[in-house]
From Swiss-Prot:
<comment type="subunit">
    <text>May interact with Ccs1.</text>
</comment>
<feature type="transmembrane region" description="Helical">
    <location>
        <begin position="46"/>
        <end position="63"/>
    </location>
</feature>
<feature type="transmembrane region" description="Helical">
    <location>
        <begin position="98"/>
        <end position="118"/>
    </location>
</feature>
<dbReference type="InterPro" id="IPR017562">
    <property type="entry name" value="Cyt_c_biogenesis_CcsA"/>
</dbReference>
<dbReference type="GO" id="GO:0017004">
    <property type="term" value="P:cytochrome complex assembly"/>
</dbReference>
<keyword id="KW-0150">Chloroplast</keyword>
<keyword id="KW-0472">Membrane</keyword>
<feature type="transmembrane region" description="Helical">
    <location>
        <begin position="143"/>
        <end position="163"/>
    </location>
</feature>
<dbReference type="InterPro" id="IPR002541">
    <property type="entry name" value="Cyt_c_assembly"/>
</dbReference>
<keyword id="KW-0201">Cytochrome c-type biogenesis</keyword>
<feature type="transmembrane region" description="Helical">
    <location>
        <begin position="258"/>
        <end position="273"/>
    </location>
</feature>
<feature type="transmembrane region" description="Helical">
    <location>
        <begin position="225"/>
        <end position="245"/>
    </location>
</feature>
<dbReference type="GO" id="GO:0020037">
    <property type="term" value="F:heme binding"/>
</dbReference>
<feature type="transmembrane region" description="Helical">
    <location>
        <begin position="286"/>
        <end position="306"/>
    </location>
</feature>
<keyword id="KW-0793">Thylakoid</keyword>
<protein>
    <recommendedName>
        <fullName>Cytochrome c biogenesis protein CcsA</fullName>
    </recommendedName>
</protein>
<dbReference type="Pfam" id="PF01578">
    <property type="entry name" value="Cytochrom_C_asm"/>
</dbReference>
Length: 317
């Protein structure tokens, strides 16, 4: 009774704190001058990470197994992983515009975990015999850590594409407006326009330099985080194959979860391969990573929606 009450308290506190933190992030993202609010939001994310850690430990002690046996527990662990990656990311690179991209991931994941869709899973249950092995901790934890890192890296790549294509659209519209300028202007008007253009170009060059720095940071950090996630994902797939061989006598069975895990691994393997070619860095590799963002969610939730295959124990039903 005490553990279940403590679990509910930690769940509500973690979601409330991360909700307030996301609101502060949005304010500081729009109004960059308010530095004190950014520090408060980071303290909120730290508190969220501690609450989620306490929640996982409480559920572990109460259920007597590592909390990764169903969709609810894996979502809590995913939210914890996202918050930890966010804190590491913020420690290495203290930039509020990058933190504002990674922080909402923990918010939406935690929000879905505590929603009414998974109410039946909030109560801890006894593990089925197939899951009462040490491979559960090794395999599932590596997979979820891989999902968390790949999701963060994919979000950074998506942000890179948004910034880049927004710039391209603006340049296209400006060039189009320049073509439609009336040719009946006198010399003084043209000279006045050139002077305004020079002032505009000076301010634009500073803005472009800042945008270039942001794009470079997004590209660099997305590559680093995706590389880390790919290592976790590979370790999770290999440990799962060994576990499957011990449990079912076959390393690979091509059920829905395994198939989509292989597709996810292939997509991000292609991404890392494109990074070896300097011509494919930046936008081209970011497109591949953005595709991977959708693939990860299909892999993570697809089998839970279908409720079939060897991994159907984590379905909604």
């Amino acid at each position: 009774m005490i553990f279940s009450t403590l679990e509910r308290i930690l769940t509500h506190i973690s979601f409330s704190v991360v909700s307030i933190g996301i609101t502060i992030y949005l304010i500081t993202f729009l109004v960059d001058e308010i530095r004190g609010l950014y520090a408060s939001s980071e303290r909120g994310m730290t508190a969220t990470a501690f609450c989620l850690t306490g929640l996982l430990i409480t559920r572990w002690v109460y259920s007597r197994h590592f909390p990764l046996s169903d969709l609810y527990e894996s979502l809590i662990f995913l939210s914890w992983s996202l918050s930890i990656i966010h804190k590491i990311f913020d420690f290495k690179n203290n930039q509020n515009h990058l933190s504002a991209i990674t922080a909402p991931s923990a918010f939406f994941t935690q929000g879905f975990a505590t929603s009414g869709f998974l109410t039946k899973m909030h109560q801890s249950r006894i593990l089925v015999p197939a899951l009462q092995v040490q491979w559960l901790m090794m395999h599932v934890s590596m997979m979820v850590l891989g999902y968390a890192a790949l999701l963060c890296g994919s979000l950074l790549s998506t942000a890179l594409l948004v910034i880049t294509f927004r710039k391209v659209i603006r340049l296209f519209l400006k060039r189009k407006n320049f073509v439609h300028v009336n040719g009946s202007f006198c010399f003084s008007e043209i000279q006045y326009m050139n002077e305004k253009k020079n002032v505009f170009l000076n301010s634009l060059s500073a803005r472009n330099y800042y945008r270039y720095q942001v794009i470079q940071q997004l590209d660099r950090w997305s590559y680093r985080i995706i590389s880390l996630g790919f290592i976790f994902l590979t370790t999770g797939i290999l440990s799962g194959a060994v576990w499957a061989n011990e449990a079912w006598g076959s390393y690979w069975n091509w059920d829905p979860k395994e198939t989509w895990a292989f597709i996810t691994w292939t997509i991000f393997g292609i991404y890392l391969h494109t990074r070896t070619n300097t011509k494919w860095e930046g936008v081209n590799s970011a497109i591949v990573a953005s595709m991977g963002f959708l693939i990860i969610w299909i892999c993570y939730f697809g089998v839970n929606l279908l409720g079939i295959g060897l991994h159907s124990y984590g379905s909604f039903n």
